[in-house]
Curated annotation (Swiss-Prot):
Belongs to the MsrA Met sulfoxide reductase family. Keywords: Oxidoreductase. It comes from Paramagnetospirillum magneticum (strain ATCC 700264 / AMB-1) (Magnetospirillum magneticum). The lineage of its organism: Bacteria, Pseudomonadati, Pseudomonadota, Alphaproteobacteria, Rhodospirillales. Its EC number is 1.8.4.11. Pfam families: PMSR. It catalyses: L-methionyl-[protein] + [thioredoxin]-disulfide + H2O = L-methionyl-(S)-S-oxide-[protein] + [thioredoxin]-dithiol; [thioredoxin]-disulfide + L-methionine + H2O = L-methionine (S)-S-oxide + [thioredoxin]-dithiol. One of its GO terms (molecular function) is L-methionine-(S)-S-oxide reductase activity. The gene is msrA. This is Peptide methionine sulfoxide reductase MsrA. NCBIfam families: msrA. One of its GO terms (biological process) is protein modification process. It comes from the Bacteria. Signal peptide: none annotated.
Amino acid sequence: MSLWGPSKTVMVSADKALPGRASEIRVPERHYVLDTLLKPPFPVGMEVACFGMGCFWGAERLFWKTGGVYSTSVGYTGGFTLNPTYEEVCSAQTGHTEAVLVAFDPAEVSYTALLRLFWEGHNPTQGMRQGNDIGTQYRSAIYWTTPEQQAAAEASAKAYGEALRRAGFGAITTEIAPAGRFYWAEGYHQQYLAKEPGGYCGLGGTGVRYG
């Protein structure tokens, strides 16, 4: 049973979401691990991807350790509240999910390779939760930034969904939608597991391989 009750797993409507604020949350200029820019504009040739895999601490580390990734950062997206705080997102009254923004060089790592990390790195069949982390902020999501990413994401969901079905899992619940505004999370969340190596990591896949 969720400590917060069943409402934590029900998406808030736009008219009932918290209003937020006009001012953005300030974050460091550079990546704690990679020493690259944390926010755009990124160097010419970089592409941007956005994934929600539950708690963003472990998800971000998965991507910053991948060759060809220029930068990663964590934040909130997919909802309604302007410039939300972590506490507001945890209340399930913003509509946002915890997400990782990945800037990558497609000449070095493909979007398909990032999709593999995404699918194998979490359980995309759990709806508004990921393991013991329960709530709308932990939903599985792919927010695409180009038509090519959309096509690849949708095709990969179909293929991986069939692999999961054969392995006895339920249907994929991953939200696949165009990327909206990304609100960077507080500075202490950025590259959290590099600063706190023994910190919580909720990542856990199904054991089913992609492709």
